[in-house]
Amino acid sequence: MIGFLSDNLLIPILDFFYGLFHSYGIAIVALTIVIRIALFPLSAGSIRSARRMKIAQPVMQKRQAEIKSRYANDPKKQQDELGKLMGEFGSPLAGCLPLLVQMPILFALFATLRGSPFADVPYLVNLKILPPEQIAAVEPKPFKSPRHSIFISDKDHFPVIASLPGGTKIAAGDSVNIKLETLSGEKYSNVLGKFENGSKFSPTWKLTKGADLASVSADGTVTAKYPGDATVEGKIPGLAAKSGFLFIKALGQVGFYVDGAINWDIAILVAGFGLTLVISQVLSGQGMPPNPQQATAQKITPIMITGMFLFFPLPAGVLLYMVIANMFQAFQTFLLNKEALPENLQKILDDQIKNQGKKELATSPAIDSERLPFEPKSNKQN
């Protein structure tokens, strides 16, 4: 499904914007905004639900406990009352469905930006090399890799898969050829022959595991030597992997620290991701009473996630998408937080803010020293 959405929805939109602006960087920004706008109704539902549950949760938990205690011996009545409670405040799971519906599209968008034309495309084949006397008992199971859209030019691209008709289990001493082909079965090498620059997109093959157990030639032929596990990688260059955008040196560049040097464009993108994450988090808590139990987690989470992406091998094009998506999310949260709440939730929120103010006043160290003559004394014991 991810491949289908990428090939039939996202890449055509990408082609359209590249045709308009002749910049893959602008095309990424435009594609991200278009998809986020299209998903606005779904993501808005999740944000609204999360906002309402954040307000209603303390009251709901208290009333749920009361209902379960009061009707402990009457399960039917208990379920009826819990159902009424959900009807009043909504289900805590209501925001999950819109999120689940949009996830395939977001995963497809992520996969599109991790592949051609923005990055080199790897095809991995895991081989099981067996002793010759054991191979006769193995039933061949044809292998096909996930498909990837390969760009040969700005307008020419097609899905390509890697296949092994005889399967991934081979005998020591045998040789097999890993085939790259289109979905219609045409050899990838034949397709490249139709383009003047086709040779630039020829795959390179190497063993990433079990180099002492097998060898692989330039045409993808694997020769097994000894029993064991081996992994073969065929990599096709990305058309726009070396294209820059604004301060980004190459959209396909991966890694914050490579060969003893810092890639400052990656560092800026990761920092931008962290900053937009914090802004979105702050906006989501606007107008809400502070929650000391969640305060520490809210401070640490953005730092942990941002730090993780410093060392996670994501292409610069994907990081650009993540920054733009976070900016859109923050703007969306800002707009939705301006919406009026239902009357019952607004009353709960007002009470929570009022009670929070009373707690802060009661715990103030200057409360007794600044007490007016007509105010009652605090219960503080000397």
UniProtKB/Swiss-Prot annotation:
It holds the Pfam family 60KD_IMP. It comes from the Bacteria. It is a multi-pass membrane protein. It is found in: Cell inner membrane. GO terms for cellular component: plasma membrane. Its main location: membrane. Residues 368-382 have a biased composition (Basic and acidic residues). One of its GO terms (biological process) is protein transport. The chain crosses the membrane at residues 20-42, 93-113, 260-280, 303-323. Residues 356-382 are annotated as: Disordered. InterPro entries: YidC/ALB3/OXA1/COX18, YidC/Oxa/ALB_C, YidC_ALB_C. Belongs to the OXA1/ALB3/YidC family. Type 1 subfamily. Required for the insertion and/or proper folding and/or complex formation of integral membrane proteins into the membrane. Involved in integration of membrane proteins that insert both dependently and independently of the Sec translocase complex, as well as at least some lipoproteins. Aids folding of multispanning membrane proteins. This is Membrane protein insertase YidC.
